[in-house]
Amino acid sequence: MSVVGIVPAAGAGERLGADVPKAFAVLGGRPMVEWSLDVLREVCDRVVVAVPPDRVQPPDFVAGGATRSESVRNALAAAPEASIVVVHDAARPLVTVELARRCLDALEDSYDGVIAAIPVTDTVKEVEHGDVVGTPDRGRLWAAQTPQVFRADALRSAAGEATDDASLVEKMGGRVRVIEGMRENFKITTPLDARVAEMLLAD
């Protein structure tokens, strides 16, 4: 069984305001993506990173796509040996080896995937054209994180575009399990997020 990590790291990250692609913005004295690579290399046999064209370094740094889903597909195509895939966002540098291992350990025979997620604590509103049209039951809502672990064949069979890979596996009828993630494993999107992450990484 070959476990391959995939890191989509081709996004520009305009909201972060950096002058380099977000995954390569300096965080805690090193490119942001390196924090995640350290973790994935502890639990995977190989890690493939989907990067902007000017950062391609075969075989493990491959060209990303115009979308996150396309970047994941490109990275997966570069790892035909994969039987299990661990997808992780470069913008979640506070992930831990323990969380990644829990995701892998939870992939039982009856599941196609396992994702880290956290229960939603705020009340969520459905809004159309500025009007509230519904209030979902908060008790059933979880905010998806990464790592997301899949049987490679299930992910290869999934098609389309989505903001997370589990959505694509779900659409093809795959069974996806949730394990509780970490509040600290937030996604860095804004300069404020980066400042908070810097403080946590310094602890």
Placement of each model-derived feature along the sequence:
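SAM-dependent methyltransferases
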Residues: M1-I6, V39, D165-A166, R183, ...
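N-terminal glycine-rich phosphate-binding loop and ensuing alpha1 helix
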Residues: M1-P53, P59
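Short beta-strand segments
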Residues: I6-A10, A50, V87-H88, A117-P119, ...
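Residue-level signal for inorganic ion chemistry
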Residues: V7, V33, A75, H88-D89, ...
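Short, high-confidence coil segments that cap the C-terminus of an alpha-helix
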Residues: C44-D45, A82, S110-V114, G174, ...
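Short phosphate-binding loop-to-helix
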Residues: Q57-V85
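Acidic metal-phosphate-binding loop of nucleotide-sugar-dependent transferases
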Residues: R68, A90-L94
